[in-house]
C-alpha cells in the first residue's frame, strides 16, 4: 500500500476512534420535567443524558449547566 493510502487509512481510523458511541442515544427520556434553573456557578457538567443520572433523576440542561436533578411532574 502506498504512503498516501496508509495516511488515509490512519486518518479514517482516527476519526472512527473519536466518534461518540450511539448505543445509548436512542433510549427514551425519563418521565417528568426539569425543575427551574438552580443558582450555581456557570458551566457545571455533571451528566450527558438522563441515563447517566442515578435513579429517577434527569439530566437537566440550563445553558452550560448540565446536572442531575429530581424531576417534577405536571398533571
From Swiss-Prot:
Q: Which SMART domains match?
A: WAP (SM00217)
Instruction: Name the cystine pairs.
Output: 34-60, 43-64, 47-59, 53-68
The residue ranges of the WAP domain are 27-72
Location in the cell:
Secreted
Q: Which GO terms describe its biological process?
A: antibacterial humoral response; innate immune response; venom-mediated disruption of cell wall in another organism
Example GO molecular function? serine-type endopeptidase inhibitor activity
What is known about the tissue distribution of this protein? Expressed by the venom gland.
Q: What does this protein do?
A: Damages membranes of susceptible bacteria. Has no hemolytic activity. Not toxic to mice. Does not inhibit the proteinases elastase and cathepsin G.
Query: What is the similarity comment for this entry?
Result: Belongs to the venom waprin family.
**Name recorded for this polypeptide:** Textwaprin-a
Species this protein is from: Pseudonaja textilis
List the taxonomic lineage: Eukaryota, Metazoa, Chordata, Craniata, Vertebrata
